[in-house]
């Protein structure tokens, strides 16, 4: 435990580990005053937020929580975790008195917020937490090697997730909405973006929906477009909608799973000729609403890579018999390459390329080296940038640079350490290499989109290593995906912030936009001031 504290070297996590290291779990002692607040800040606020807005998880200060659950039920959820969710068991980290202190803090803070005052300012809670969303349009940014201006091309997208350019310069944008929209966008803005009709039935909820979109490498010849989306068993009825204030672990969900398909778009903007590339058996489907992963990548050698998260159960990541928590490699038609690493491993899925992943949301190939890079959400901190290699184990379920009950090791023999990792969390999503010539100093850089951090990061890659990085911009909205257009410019999908301080639950649809980064040269700057 003390070794783990030193490895993290972060105040919030160190506070939690210091408290939990003083006494063995289950020891009978009275929690000192204020301990519940400190434990909550270190272990809970990262997911549940610190006010009524909540975070990735629901607010634990909602007074309705205590009308639907008894204190013993809340205690059990903290101690044992919640099946089919991201809530891990804390029983091995916190003793009974410490859990009780957290519950006492939930009661007191809930009453405080319900009374309309915040702990720090005394201002009305609603006034303290609600802010207007930022507007990135027109923002001039000065980065280390390039000045640019953000231009909004399309506004009011509905929770956009993936983007991919067609050869003619138009681009496809997937929207992770209740209906799952695929938009065909003209970057010039000359026409409203039409919606592609005839898509497959898409399961939506929490992380689910229409996810990535990718244009096949031979599109000019065969017209194939690839989609990743969440699917549920149509033979099962939809559970009734939960009553307002229902605790997350009491919400009933249909089992669901990531599916990869390809199809074509005809002249009437209809999805046609669909073929399945990957579909798991019904037994793999899970009611969890978390960690679908779902990015698609082509390697230029006739292979398709795609990512699937472990769906909130870290045991899946180390199990080669399940597709969950893996990067997969198939041929363009979904067949299995003969040289995949586990083709001859008894009980293993032959599509697996690498394993030990939590929630991989970014995949990119370095055009200079052919090496594949990945971004991955950690638990509380411990987000990763990984170099993905054949048959490698990236450790989730056994090791983590973040805070996860049940995991004490930060590294282990036979498990690959990340090339870069982040604490506190930035929630990395889409990534992409830039190989154009429109931005001086950016050629060869890996760009990383960050959700919680509301950041676009630029990483300098040399061979197999991350040698430097900068935050290109931040605090302008959640940054979801990035792509280089045929014009050599960078296009970015962004959404309004969610969670604490924004009065928007992260599970709700949220307004998004497509922006372009227009380079500013020194000649333009000098002309402006003449």
Residue ranges and their predicted role:
Residues 348-384:
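Repeat-solenoid scaffold signature
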Residues 22-39, 292, 349:
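Electrostatic cytochrome c docking/interface patches
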Residues 357, 466-486:
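Conserved blade-ending motifs and adjacent loop-strand segments that build the rim/top face
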Residues 194-208, 273-291, 332-353, 396-423:
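Surface-exposed loop and turn segments in beta-propeller and other repeat-based domains
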Residues 95, 99, 109-314, 362-365, ...:
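Acidic, Gly/Ser/Thr-rich repeat motifs that build Ca2+-stabilized beta-propeller blades
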Residues 9-20:
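Bacterial N-terminal signal peptides
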């Amino acid at each position: 435990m003390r070794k783990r504290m030193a490895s993290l070297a972060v105040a919030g996590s160190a506070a939690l580990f210091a408290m939990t290291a003083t006494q063995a779990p289950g020891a009978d002692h009275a929690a000192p005053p204020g301990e519940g607040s400190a434990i909550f800040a270190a272990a809970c606020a990262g997911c549940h937020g610190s006010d009524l807005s909540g975070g990735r998880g629901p607010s634990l200060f909602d007074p309705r929580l205590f009308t639907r659950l008894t204190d013993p039920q809340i205690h059990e959820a903290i101690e044992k975790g919640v099946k089919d969710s991201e809530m891990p068991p804390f029983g091995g980290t916190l003793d009974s008195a410490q859990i009780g202190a957290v519950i006492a803090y939930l009661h007191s803070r809930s009453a405080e917020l319900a009374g309309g005052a915040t702990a720090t300012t005394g201002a009305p809670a609603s006034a303290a937490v609600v802010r207007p969303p930022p507007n990135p349009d027109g923002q001039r940014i000065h980065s280390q090697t390039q000045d640019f201006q953000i231009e909004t091309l399309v506004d009011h997208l509905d929770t956009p997730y993936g983007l991919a350019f067609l050869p003619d310069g138009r681009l496809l944008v997937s929207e992770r909405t209740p209906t799952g929209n695929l938009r065909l966008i003209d970057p010039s803005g000359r026409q409203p973006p039409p919606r592609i009709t005839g898509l497959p039935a898409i399961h939506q909820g929490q992380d689910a929906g229409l996810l990535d979109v990718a244009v096949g490498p031979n599109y000019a010849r065969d017209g194939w477009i690839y989609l990743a989306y969440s699917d549920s068993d149509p033979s099962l009825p939809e559970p009734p909608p939960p009553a307002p204030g229902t605790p997350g672990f009491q919400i009933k969900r249909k089992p669901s799973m990531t599916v990869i398909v390809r199809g074509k778009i005809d002249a009437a903007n209809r999805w046609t000729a669909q073929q399945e590339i990957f579909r798991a058996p019904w037994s793999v489907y899970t009611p969890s609403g978390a960690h679908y992963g779902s990015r698609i990548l082509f390697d230029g050698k006739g292979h398709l890579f795609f990512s699937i998260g472990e769906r909130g159960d870290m045991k899946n990541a180390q199990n080669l018999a399940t597709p969950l928590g893996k990067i997969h490699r198939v041929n363009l038609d979904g067949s299995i390459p003969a040289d995949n690493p586990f083709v001859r491993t008894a009980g293993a899925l032959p599509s697996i390329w690498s394993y030990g992943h939590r929630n991989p949301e970014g995949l990119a190939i370095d055009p200079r080296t052919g090496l594949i890079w990945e971004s991955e959400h950690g638990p509380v901190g411990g987000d990763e940038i990984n170099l993905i290699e054949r048959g490698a184990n990236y450790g989730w379920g056994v090791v983590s640079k973040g805070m996860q009950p049940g995991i004490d090791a930060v590294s282990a023999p036979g498990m690959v350490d990340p090339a870069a990792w982040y604490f506190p969390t930035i929630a990395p999503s889409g990534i992409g290499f830039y190989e154009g010539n429109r931005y001086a100093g950016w050629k060869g850089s890996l760009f990383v989109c960050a959700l919680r951090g509301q950041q676009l990061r630029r990483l300098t890659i040399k061979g197999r290593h991350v040698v430097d990085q900068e935050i290109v911009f931040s605090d302008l909205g959640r940054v979801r995906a990035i792509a280089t257009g045929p014009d050599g410019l960078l296009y970015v999908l962004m959404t309004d912030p969610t969670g604490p301080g924004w009065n928007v639950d992260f599970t709700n649809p949220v307004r998004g936009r497509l922006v372009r980064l227009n380079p500013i040269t020194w000649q333009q700057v000098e002309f402006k001031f003449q």
